[in-house]
Amino acid sequence: MPADYSSTARALSVSTSSPEPLSPSEDEAYPPWSRRAPGRRNSASISGGRSATLRDQIIDRATKTYHQILESWRKMNFWQRVGAVAAFLLANLLGIGFLVFTGKVFIWLQPVAAQWEHSPLAYGVLWLCVFFVSFPPLVGWSTFGTMAGYIFGIWKGWLLYASATVLGSTCSFIVSRTILSKFVHRLMERDKRFAALSLTLKYDGLKLLCMIRLCPLPYSVCNGAVSTFPTVQPLMYGLATALISPKLLVPAFIGNRLRVLSENNEEMSAGSKAVNICSIIVSICIGIFTGLYIYRRTLARAKELEAKEREDIRRSLQADHAAHRPHDAFSEDPEVNSAAALLARDEEERIGFGDLDDDHVDLAIDDESGSETSPHRTQASPYRDEFTDNDSDVFKDGDGTHEEMYTLHTHVRRP
């Protein structure tokens, strides 16, 4: 019998689970570029270079995007998939058509540019065009900037472009905030990321706004998107746009070089043409890489400020919880307080304050209607022995008649 018991125990102690993964086709859920060869699994840890880290970030981002697109595609029905493909093709056709149209515009401008250069009417019309494309969802802002440099030269074109951009973006900000006010409130109540980003702008709001304006984002859409942040004021947004106005010299310079190439094409030497073409390419590359660099810095700064804001809220919650006192308002501004309250609820769930601690016993006093009082309400209105004019002293009134009753409902609530 002991031998049978020992053999049975040894048999039960042997693991019957296979060390291999249950699903041999697990890698099929990942796109081809995210799969690594067996010999390269530890290549990132061996190299440890910055290029490996950047490569991993690009692969992870591409993988997440691939999964999101694939998940959205699987949720669509037949007609939704047809509409998505049609919208994708239409967007590509519009983009190609816009590029072709832009080229035709500069060909058409070549014979009239010299006449319009000293025309106040042409100056005013182009200024209004730049102003109105500031409102979403209009496009053509960069094209109008290049046209300004093409017709009026670098400095005069930049002055037109910058002044119309500053005033147009400010007016677009005000109009978008007025129209999108209800959308802002709904977004503040539901989206924690939106609330966190709006709170980060209260620290170095002007600096972050300038970085956002330098990012390669759609101009008119950016005006409408930033207007939804309640912590950003119109004057601050206009000031940030004015501070980054030297960036607008790039399209004006490109337009001026295009005119020089078109007018003096036959007279210019090969070296002069190469210099002008290279200056255009270098200007475009500087604008693209500067925008991408600032975009990454903006995201990093926003994450840093969000972490700081969450840390401050977490300390406040822990201090209030330890002192058994209700949470005060985070800010006098109702919009800022609403965003902070949303983050506070998220932090309470992370910390675990949503669940009551077993070591504490709270005394909850129900009202006459028998409704339960939440722990937050109990802390806000603690039990008191004093009587006010509206309360009755049961010891002073005596027993009273047989029909009169005084009841005190107390419950010791253990979470």
From Swiss-Prot:
The keyword Membrane is assigned to this record: yes
A Pfam family it matches: VTT_dom
Biased composition range(s): Polar residues: 1-10, 371-381
Keywords: Golgi apparatus, Membrane, Transmembrane, Transmembrane helix
Keyword DNA-binding: no
Chain ranges on the Lumenal side, renumbered to this chain: 1-81, 142-157, 256-273
Main location: Golgi
PANTHER family per the UniProt record, alphabetical: GOLGI APPARATUS MEMBRANE PROTEIN TVP38, GOLGI APPARATUS MEMBRANE PROTEIN TVP38-RELATED
Record-given protein name: Golgi apparatus membrane protein tvp38
Gene name per UniProt: tvp38
